[in-house]
Amino acid sequence: GVGPRYCPSIETKVDIGVHNLVSPDLAEICFDLGKLDDAVTILADSNEQVVAEKLRSLLRIGAASTRYKDVFDIYYLLCKKGVRERELDDAVRALVIEDPTMRERSYGDIANRLSRVFGDRRFKRELSRAKNNWLEISPDKVTSAITAYFS
């Protein structure tokens, strides 16, 4: 037979962003389409760019944020995967510290804001829900590590 149920498929999720890149350091990822003798290539932001963008969103929205998974993503990229410190500093400066629309003007400001956000009761409760914690690591450990990183 022919049709969708006989065609192999791979489900994926792609986050499409339209923004000014801090760094032109994009990773080129190629997906081989097998029997079609073709491939699809996408460009992916660096880990540093992703951390800076997720951090910016968290700082901007604060405890009202509902993007709890981003907290675990930031932790993973900073503490498990690793980032290049200079490139992260460049991205954080461009997207947060030097952006006139942001309130944070230093790493101290960032750490203070993160402490307030992570200390909010509702935010802590939602962050601790299992579906948000794809790393299965204590939310307190995650938030402490992120705050310490930017201190």
Range-by-range predicted roles:
Residues G1-S151:
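Structured mid-to-C-terminal alpha-helical surface segments
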